[in-house]
């Protein structure tokens, strides 16, 4: 197999990268009806598999789970997830031939083997579904020409897919149809019905492409979503400990601080997050973030270049073939970092203190969001995709750090995201440690600016505010958050 993206000419590549349209709620007026009366079989029952299946069943769809016979015989966790929730569970051979829609929700590294196994069992004219297009775009999987291939990609971990559905809402979702596999012209009808079955239409769906989803998803998760949180946690903790700050306080400020500052980001973008700081702290955070952007821009651009060229994917797949020796080694090293092992305590930090004493964290978030967004849009990815894969998902990932530090983040994200995270953090951590952290003090991480005057230069403050608010990520963010608010009003009202 060869990388699908590389088989496209430049015009086709740019067209696929630039596919992203926010879909009107009226386009989902029939909700999941197109799939009602049809047989949906999900392969794999991890977080995405189970929670998408629960939502689809509650939306009136007929859902079953196909697992390997060994997983059934040994009653592995995937079998327990499905059977304990009352789903029919059976082997590939029993369920796949009956399926109208087969949804592959196994880990990325298993996709080739799974698809090569299930494809001969699928009936003529059936549909194969993905929630991440890596297998199609990066591995170049060729699908039988009579099969339709679609994607529904919720922009959050599987647990949130379920929780938002139970609240009567959903999560923003990218949907796509593989242009090489839509023989009956029904791909979009199937994708829309599947998305509606998960509740995604209530939060807003983006009409995208397999290429745009994969390239933007890889970039976001490697850099701002995971890599920057990991590198930032490690170097900020080291700084505070070296300067005499209590280990429990330093660890808690970081573990729960990322979640707190990005919660502000979720509601009002970078502008609102920065507005949570005092005026002197805002100017300080702005200056720090500008320095960080200058320092880290080459690294962000390298990751984007390696994703576009396919170098990242080929490197990771080589590690798959080598029994994940690099991935597992980096995972172990992360578990041994000082931040991961800081002592627990009953200490409580007031919400505003996370901002006041975490000025550098705010600066890192602003720098990381803007750098990731800029790298993506400069490569042909449109603003909407870049927003969802940078700013929008960051609070969701920060929440996993709050639960169980970096370990939880790396468990919840895919192996693909985890591998990319380590690639980024392994370079970003020493870069920050050597070139940036010696230039800052605990007034920006750990202790705060203290009892200083709030007086600032008015012209400087105006310049800072205008620069923050006029970044393209703020314009598209305000527009998309507005759509989501409107969608939620309609969903709740309905």
Swiss-Prot record:
- Protein name as annotated: Ketol-acid reductoisomerase (NADP(+))
- Gene this protein is translated from: ilvC
Q: Which residues cross the membrane?
A: none
Q: Which SUPFAM superfamilies does the entry mention? A: 6-phosphogluconate dehydrogenase C-terminal domain-like, NAD(P)-binding Rossmann-fold domains
- Quote the pathway field: Amino-acid biosynthesis; L-isoleucine biosynthesis; L-isoleucine from 2-oxobutanoate: step 2/4; Amino-acid biosynthesis; L-valine biosynthesis; L-valine from pyruvate: step 2/4
Its cofactor is: Mg(2+)
Q: Kindly give the PANTHER family that the UniProt entry links to this protein.
A: KETOL-ACID REDUCTOISOMERASE, MITOCHONDRIAL (PTHR21371:SF1)
> What PROSITE patterns does the record point to?
KARI_C (PS51851), KARI_N (PS51850)
- Domain KARI N-terminal Rossmann, by residue range, is 14-208
Q: Where does Mg(2+) 2 bind?
A: 217, 389, 393
Enzyme class (EC, first level):
oxidoreductase
Q: Name one GO cellular component term.
A: cytosol
Highest classification ranks of the organism: Bacteria, Pseudomonadati, Pseudomonadota, Gammaproteobacteria, Vibrionales
Q: Does the keyword Metal-binding apply?
A: yes
Q: Which organism is it from?
A: Aliivibrio salmonicida (strain LFI1238) (Vibrio salmonicida (strain LFI1238))
Positions annotated as active site in the UniProt record: 132
Gene Ontology molecular functions: ketol-acid reductoisomerase activity; magnesium ion binding
Binding residues for NADP(+): 45-48, 68, 76, 78, 108-110, 158
Q: Its catalytic activity? A: (2R)-2,3-dihydroxy-3-methylbutanoate + NADP(+) = (2S)-2-acetolactate + NADPH + H(+); (2R,3R)-2,3-dihydroxy-3-methylpentanoate + NADP(+) = (S)-2-ethyl-2-hydroxy-3-oxobutanoate + NADPH + H(+)
Details of cofactor binding: Binds 2 magnesium ions per subunit.
Biological process (GO), any one: L-valine biosynthetic process
This molecule's function is given as: Involved in the biosynthesis of branched-chain amino acids (BCAA). Catalyzes an alkyl-migration followed by a ketol-acid reduction of (S)-2-acetolactate (S2AL) to yield (R)-2,3-dihydroxy-isovalerate. In the isomerase reaction, S2AL is rearranged via a Mg-dependent methyl migration to produce 3-hydroxy-3-methyl-2-ketobutyrate (HMKB). In the reductase reaction, this 2-ketoacid undergoes a metal-dependent reduction by NADPH to yield (R)-2,3-dihydroxy-isovalerate.
Enzyme Commission code(s) on record? 1.1.1.86
Domain KARI C-terminal knotted, chain residue ranges per copy? 209-344, 345-487
Q: Could you say which protein family the record assigns here?
A: Belongs to the ketol-acid reductoisomerase family.
Which residues are involved in binding substrate?
414
Q: Read off the NCBIfam families from this record.
A: ilvC (TIGR00465), PRK05225.1 (NF003557)
Give me the residues that bind Mg(2+) 1, please: 217, 221
């Amino acid at each position: 197999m060869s990388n699908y993206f590389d088989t496209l000419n430049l015009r086709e590549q740019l067209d696929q990268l630039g596919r992203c349209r926010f879909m009107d709620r009226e386009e989902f007026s029939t909700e999941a009806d197109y799939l009602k009366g049809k047989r949906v079989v999900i392969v794999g029952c991890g977080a995405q598999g189970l929670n998408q299946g629960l939502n689809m069943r509650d939306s009136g769809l007929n859902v079953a789970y196909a697992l390997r016979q060994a997983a059934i015989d040994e009653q592995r966790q995937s079998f327990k997830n499905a059977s304990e929730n009352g789903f029919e569970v059976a082997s590939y051979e029993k369920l796949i031939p009956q399926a109208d829609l087969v949804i592959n929700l196994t880990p990325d590294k298993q996709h080739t083997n799974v698809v090569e196994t299930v494809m001969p069992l699928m009936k003529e004219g059936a549909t194969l579904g993905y929630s991440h297009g890596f297998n199609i775009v990066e591995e170049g999987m060729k699908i039988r020409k009579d099969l339709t291939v679609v994607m529904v990609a919720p922009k959050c971990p599987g647990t949130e897919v379920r929780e938002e559905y139970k609240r009567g809402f959903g999560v923003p979702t990218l949907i796509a149809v593989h242009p090489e596999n839509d023989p009956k012209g029904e791909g979009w009808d199937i994708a829309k019905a599947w998305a509606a079955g998960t509740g995604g239409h209530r939060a807003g769906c983006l009409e995208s492409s397999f290429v745009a989803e994969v390239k933007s998803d890889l970039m976001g998760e490697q850099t701002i979503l995971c890599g920057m949180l990991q590198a930032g946690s490690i170097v900020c903790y080291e700084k505070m400990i070296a300067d005499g700050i209590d280990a429990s306080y330093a660890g808690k400020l970081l573990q729960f601080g990322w979640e707190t500052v990005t919660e502000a980001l979720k509601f009002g973008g970078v502008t609102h997050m920065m507005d949570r700081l005092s005026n002197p702290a805002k100017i300080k955070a702005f200056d720090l973030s500008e320095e960080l952007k200058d320092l880290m821009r080459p690294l962000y651009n390298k990751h984007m270049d390696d994703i576009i060229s396919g170098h990242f994917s080929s490197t990771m797949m080589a590690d798959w073939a080598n029994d994940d020796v690099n991935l597992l080694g980096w995972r172990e090293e992360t578990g041994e970092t000082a931040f991961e092992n800081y002592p627990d305590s009953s200490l409580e930090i007031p919400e505003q203190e996370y901002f006041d004493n975490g000025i550098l964290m705010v600066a890192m978030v602003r720098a990381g969001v803007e750098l990731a967004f800029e790298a993506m849009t400069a490569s042909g990815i449109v603003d909407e995709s870049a927003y969802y894969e940078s700013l929008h998902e960051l609070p969701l990932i920060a929440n996993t750090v709050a639960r169980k530090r970096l370990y939880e983040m790396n468990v919840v994200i895919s192996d693909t995201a985890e591998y990319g995270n380590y690639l980024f953090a392994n370079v970003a951590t020493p870069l920050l440690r050597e070139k940036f952290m010696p230039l800052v003090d605990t007034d920006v991480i750990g202790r705060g600016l203290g009892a200083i005057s709030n007086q600032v230069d008015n012209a400087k403050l105006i310049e800072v505010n205008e620069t923050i608010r006029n970044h393209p990520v703020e314009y598209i963010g305000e527009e998309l958050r507005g759509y989501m608010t409107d969608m939620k009003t309609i969903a709740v009202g309905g």
